């Protein structure tokens, strides 16, 4: 089982320095989505005092030609802070700062999907859209092999590992526990976690978050996971089908509700939203992974608890459907529905924006509507 060389270094030496006092100064780590639409980058600056809100944080810049976001001849890109969290690695008063990215002309970068999403969420704020996203991931060794899998074969068949207990059923629970606690410390709205169906696969849930905050919290939770995995010397992949063959893929099931859906007889509004989604399936498939559906084509096969990528379906307690209505929601006739098609490597801003456009703004067709300022 290959782990990184840095994970074998003496961590006690680092702690000797991390315990030094830092006076009134604060380290703020700025985090952003790079030009791939999947990767995260970060850099740290020193502030003279602890910021009390995100508005007190200064804008910054970076070399976009090194992150697939600009040409080297015009490489300066701008970081605009939009969300602030406690830093679980350096601890208080230090901060994690999630940022939007803007070009030299102050237009949003191509992978800054938050900018448009924020505008769409503001348009429906009176409906109080809530989201919860279930982030699946697979642990790999530094050689790209699933962590804990035999080097020359496969583990036992699926069925033993979901919510599994024991060294032969749940690999690297310590990573999950460290990530969970780090998210709680940071103020990320993490609500649960468990071992998934495939060996070395885990899931954590973020939410419920209202509107734009869903994407902020999920991206920062992903960042924290990558940092935790680095300390343990392994890799977390959000690939939608990291292991070909008879193994589960990885999704990011997205739960959605509005105020009216959560109220008495809200099931009526849930069914109306599902009907709208059924007429716009191709648009949503394109929005549900960063490659416009190509990643999900490997995952949404109609097998391994997925629907077929080409067909829309919905049902109560049906995990092979595009949309699942939880049984308790069907019984209570109010609550939420689960969109099961988003891939594990989706951009949460793209997913939540698409759902709102179709379900609340009543858009139709294969392209998003362009609203005037």
Swiss-Prot record:
Positions that bind ATP: 134, 203-208, 255-257, 319, 324
One of the GO BP terms on file: intracellular ammonium homeostasis
Enzyme Commission number(s) from the entry: 6.3.1.2, 2.3.1.225
Localization terms from the record: Cytoplasm, Cytosol; Microsome; Mitochondrion; Cell membrane
Native source species: Cricetulus griseus
Catalyzed reactions per annotation: L-glutamate + NH4(+) + ATP = L-glutamine + ADP + phosphate + H(+); L-cysteinyl-[protein] + hexadecanoyl-CoA = S-hexadecanoyl-L-cysteinyl-[protein] + CoA
Biological role stated in the UniProt entry: Glutamine synthetase that catalyzes the ATP-dependent conversion of glutamate and ammonia to glutamine. Its role depends on tissue localization: in the brain, it regulates the levels of toxic ammonia and converts neurotoxic glutamate to harmless glutamine, whereas in the liver, it is one of the enzymes responsible for the removal of ammonia.
Matches recorded under Pfam families: Gln-synt_C (PF00120), Gln-synt_N (PF03951)
Post-translational modification: Palmitoylated; undergoes autopalmitoylation.
Family membership: Belongs to the glutamine synthetase family.
Regulation of activity: Glutamine synthetase activity is inhibited by methionine sulfoximine (MSO).
Protein name as it appears in the record: Glutamine synthetase
Subunit structure: Decamer; composed of two pentamers. Interacts with PALMD. Interacts with RHOJ. Interacts with BEST2; this interaction tethers a fraction of GLUL to the membrane, causing a decrease of cytosolic glutamine synthase (GS) activity and inhibits the chloride channel activity of BEST2 by affecting the gating at the aperture in the absence of intracellular glutamate.
List of residues that carry N6-acetyllysine: 11, 14
Residues annotated as domain GS beta-grasp: 24-106
Membrane topology, from the record: Lipid-anchor
Binding site for ADP: 336-338
